[in-house]
């Protein structure tokens, strides 16, 4: 088959630049149709009468005969299409809803070839292969059963829509329930109920957090000026309300012992860690669930002190962060060493340094500066009282005597 038997598609649209030197046929009446709109055969051509391809309907008997329709569909009307040199106009997305119901569909128009080589390949392949239309049974299986527009709100075609409009769900209010598929109905209702319960729990948590005041800064947590500060710092062993910034500042201070800073500022109950949360949790079960989520999330982050085995974590096996080696394997928790102090107390330590002993000895041997100053002032007063009155005081007392 030569290229002269294939109609030049660029000539049909009036954009052929080769003119008489074109290798394709510029006579629509003598050439064979080179393009058949496969989307029109499925009933899903979104371009309607503005389609550049031939609209060929399937015969009523389902055989090999064709019924030509649409723009340039008949061979007799091909010359009219070529003489008119109709230009292709792309249909806007919002105008697709105004197309007739028979041309509505979800498939997208196939792009036209950009080069002459693509045109040759497309024309030869479409003319040489057998024009056997696809069976409608296979096409109906590919089409969605439920109308996608009715499922998300409103369908423009309503009763004239070629798709099935499902039953309305009582929870979400959308037409997404298939009347012929009980399994799909039960699955959707189950998912809707789970989503509804999650939304209700979130609404209760928001309402519970509206009037919670931080016990340190005395401000309503959810009404702070900086949006990043509108988070609660929930203590693992306490139910007092603190904002995350205040409780972290309290636990990071170095002016007190570790036992004091880990305790609640109000009830003095020690908590191992602080849980950041957008909502306040008072129920103990919800709090335990929040703690488990916090531990699982933190356990995936690498520990900055361990540093993949290059450093030493002061928390040892109690650390909530991930202790992993460079190859990804988890490291065994370090066994902290025990040290017995001079006062009989036992402390755990991972590393022993000489400076720790020197610093501890100085803290125990040297008295506090304030206490030392108080002792000096008391000794001075005692010495003055024991030494008797001064000469000036004695002279003043003698003058005042009668």
Swiss-Prot record:
Where's it found, cell-wise?
A: Cytoplasm; Nucleus
Name the Pfam families for this protein: zf-CCCH, zf-CCCH_2, zf-CCCH_3
Alphabetized UniProt keyword annotations: Cytoplasm, Developmental protein, Differentiation, Metal-binding, Neurogenesis, Nucleus, Repeat, Transcription, Transcription regulation, Transferase, Ubl conjugation pathway, Zinc, Zinc-finger
**Main subcellular location of this protein, as a coarse class:** cytoplasm
Zn finger region (C3H1-type): 2-29, 31-58, 141-168, 297-326
Pathway assigned to this chain's UniProt record? Protein modification; protein ubiquitination
Zinc finger boundaries on the chain: RING-type: 214-268
Annotated Gene Ontology cellular component terms:
cytoplasm; nucleus
Concerning Gene3D superfamilies, the annotation shows: Pneumovirus matrix protein 2 (M2), zinc-binding domain, Zinc finger, CCCH-type, Zinc/RING finger domain, C3HC4 (zinc finger)
The chemistry this enzyme catalyses reads: S-ubiquitinyl-[E2 ubiquitin-conjugating enzyme]-L-cysteine + [acceptor protein]-L-lysine = [E2 ubiquitin-conjugating enzyme]-L-cysteine + N(6)-ubiquitinyl-[acceptor protein]-L-lysine
* Stored InterPro entries: MKRN-like, Znf-CCCH_3, Znf_CCCH, Znf_CCCH_sf, Znf_RING, Znf_RING/FYVE/PHD, Znf_RING_CS
A Gene Ontology molecular function term for this protein is: ubiquitin protein ligase activity
Which GO biological process entries does UniProt record here?
cell differentiation; nervous system development; protein polyubiquitination
The function of this protein is:
E3 ubiquitin ligase catalyzing the covalent attachment of ubiquitin moieties onto substrate proteins. Inhibits neurogenesis and axis formation during embryonic development by modulating the phosphatidylinositol 3-kinase (PI3K) pathway. Acts downstream of PI3K and akt1 to up-regulate gsk3b mRNA expression.
Under PANTHER family, the record lists: E3 UBIQUITIN-PROTEIN LIGASE MAKORIN-2, MAKORIN-RELATED
Q: Can you name this protein?
A: E3 ubiquitin-protein ligase makorin-2
């Amino acid at each position: 088959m030569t290229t002269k038997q294939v109609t030049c598609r660029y000539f049909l649209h009036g954009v052929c630049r080769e003119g008489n030197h074109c290798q394709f046929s510029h006579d629509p009446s003598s050439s064979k149709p080179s393009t058949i709109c496969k989307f029109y055969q499925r009933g899903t051509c979104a371009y309607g009468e503005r389609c550049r391809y031939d609209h060929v309907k399937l015969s009523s008997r389902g055989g090999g005969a064709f019924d030509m329709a649409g723009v340039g569909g008949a061979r007799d009307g091909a010359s009219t299409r070529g003489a008119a040199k109709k230009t292709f106009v792309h249909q806007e997305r919002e105008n697709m809803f105004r197309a007739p119901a028979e041309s509505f569909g979800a498939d997208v128009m196939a792009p036209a070839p950009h080069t002459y080589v693509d045109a040759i390949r497309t024309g030869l392949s479409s003319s040489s292969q057998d024009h056997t239309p696809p069976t409608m049974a296979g096409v109906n299986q590919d089409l969605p059963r439920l109308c996608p527009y009715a499922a998300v709100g409103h369908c423009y075609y309503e009763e004239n829509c070629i798709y099935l409009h499902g039953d309305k769900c009582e929870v979400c209010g959308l037409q997404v329930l298939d009347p012929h598929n009980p399994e799909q109905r039960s699955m959707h209702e189950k998912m809707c109920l789970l989503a509804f319960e999650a939304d209700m729990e979130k609404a209760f948590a928001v309402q519970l957090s509206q009037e919670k005041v931080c016990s340190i800064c005395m401000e309503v947590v959810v009404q702070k000026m900086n949006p990043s500060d509108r988070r609660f710092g929930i203590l693992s062993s306490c139910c007092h309300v603190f904002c995350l910034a205040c409780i972290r500042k309290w636990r990071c201070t170095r002016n007190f012992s570790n036992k004091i800073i880990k305790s609640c500022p109000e009830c003095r109950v020690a908590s191992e860690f602080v849980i950041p949360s957008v909502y306040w949790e008072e129920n103990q079960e919800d709090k335990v669930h929040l703690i488990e989520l916090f531990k699982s999330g933190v356990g995936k982050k690498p520990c900055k002190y361990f540093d993949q085995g290059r450093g030493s974590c002061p928390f040892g096996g109690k650390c909530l962060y991930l202790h992993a080696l460079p190859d990804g394997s988890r490291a065994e928790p370090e066994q902290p060493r025990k040290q017995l102090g001079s006062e009989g107390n036992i402390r755990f330590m991972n590393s022993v340094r000489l400076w720790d002993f020197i610093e501890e000895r100085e803290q125990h041997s040297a008295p506090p500066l304030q206490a030392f100053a108080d002792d000096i002032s008391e000794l001075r007063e005692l010495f003055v009282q024991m030494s008797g009155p001064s000469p000036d005081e004695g002279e003043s007392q003698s003058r005042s005597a009668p």
